[in-house]
Amino acid sequence: MRAAAARSAVVSRTERSVTLTAGSVTATVDAATGYLSGYAVRGCELMRSPLVPNFWRASTDNDRRGWRTRERMGAWRTMPERLKLESLNAADGAVTAVVCGGGVRLALRYRLAADGELAVSYDLRIADTLPEPLRIGLQALWSGELDRYVYCGRGPGENYADRKEGSLFGVYSGSTADFSPAYIYPQECGNRCDVRYLQLAGKGGGVVFAGRQPLCVSVWPCTQEALDAAEHTHEIVRLDDAWLVNVDCAQAGVGGTDSWSVKSRPSEAYRLLEKHYGYEFVIAPAGTPADAARTSRRVAYKNE
């Protein structure tokens, strides 16, 4: 049965986009940027913005006051704006895009299987001259109708690379609106580590993000820019009928030996000091938690 599901999707191309179609799923890649711009199930579009690279985070107290990340690593804050499409190729049910700029080369590959599972592969190369990023990942806005979540990973509350040992691995669920806490001073929040899958669902169905390896994920009711700009919770500009979903390879730890000097940064083991990062995850229809779990099992063990 899985051999049949591996057949190539139908690829169609226009000046503006490349479309992959298989069964009830249509995935669209923007021909100008190389980014995934649409994921529709049975004609219902679930994405509200393109899936774009993210190397930054809304500054934590330690980032702002001690590590001073805006001064030391500020190039990463606007790096996505400097990435320009270098090549875009479509063949055998897959689209490969390469974007470059600012000392960064990022290759993204989207492959749609006949059962609607869209594999997203990410390969990042960083120039030696660049400082370390705070995050390696992708983010997009998804339909606000996806008002419930289920995930398999560490929880139930937020946790980070250097703050996760007390968070037990399990399956957690709730209202999407409650996924991330609200800090008095808005900042990075809501991350979950070692996530096998995250399902978001509503009355009309759902979607799952399942990793070939453990992921970091978070879901916010606002953009990262809005979170970073506000100084009080009531100042956060909230999204209208959308959730921002981060699906990340990794994020730096929060540190905190103190909060007023460079000692506030995380130890080297929890910083992103490598110059090459790669990961892969699948986006697939998932109307129930059982659907999400089955997809995750297939994805995680595909190459074993």
State each model region's role.
Residues 2-304:
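Beta-strand/loop-rich accessory regions of lumenal/periplasmic or secreted enzymes
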